[in-house]
From Swiss-Prot:
Gene: nuoB
Topology term for the membrane: Peripheral membrane protein
Co-factor requirement: [4Fe-4S] cluster
GO molecular function, one term: iron ion binding
Record key words, sorted: 4Fe-4S, Cell inner membrane, Cell membrane, Iron, Iron-sulfur, Membrane, Metal-binding, NAD, Quinone, Translocase, Transport, Ubiquinone
Cofactor note: Binds 1 [4Fe-4S] cluster.
Catalytic activity annotation: a quinone + NADH + 5 H(+)(in) = a quinol + NAD(+) + 4 H(+)(out)
Protein name per the record: NADH-quinone oxidoreductase subunit B
Length: 172
């Protein structure tokens, strides 16, 4: 009996079945983002406004969660102190994989106007950040745009990608 070797690889060298499954999995992940509500300062007010009836992020599949075990996106909004950074890191570690982080506001991105010994000068020193959202304080429309950019990023990445191979996005 003759045996034929069939090549199931695409032009990129990846198996066709796996790339199709990756696209399906990433589509599901991108359309059901569940951010962890973690507001630290002024930006938290804008984050809360984004969940209210005027902007209603729930209609896009973005449902805010209070437990890190139910969340896959962490939005760090506001100034992060060094004392509080241990708690933020613990929450990040408790989140399920895959997980993404949005740094919201100038204080979270670079420490803002608080250049002191007690302030972390950028959340990315504690937690790997996927999207940097500039502004003081960014409007809910900007947060909505950041979530849309995160959805595009999730659709592009491989389903087995870990946090070390991710690339950061800066929204300007």
């Amino acid at each position: 009996m003759a045996q034929h070797q069939v090549n199931y690889a695409s032009a990129a060298g990846l198996p066709i079945a796996l790339t199709s499954v990756d696209k399906l999995v990433n589509w599901g992940r991108s359309n059901s983002l569940w951010p962890l509500t973690y507001g630290l300062a002024c930006c938290a007010i804008e984050m809360m406004a984004s969940g209210a009836s005027r902007y209603d992020f729930d209609r896009m599949g973005t449902i805010f969660r209070a437990s890190p075990r139910q969340a896959d996106v962490m939005i760090l909004a506001g100034t992060l102190s060094k004392k509080h950074s241990e708690f933020a890191r613990r929450l990040y570690d408790q989140m399920t994989e895959p997980k993404w982080v949005i740094s919201m506001g100038s204080c979270a991105n670079t420490g803002g106007m608080f250049n002191t010994y007690a302030t972390v000068q950028g959340v990315d020193r504690i937690i790997p950040v996927d999207i940097y959202l500039p502004g003081c304080a960014p409007r809910p429309e900007t947060l909505q745009y950041a979530l849309m950019m995160l959805q595009k990023k999730i659709r592009r990445e491989s389903a087995n990608m870990n946090n070390n191979t991710k690339q950061n996005l800066r929204l300007v």
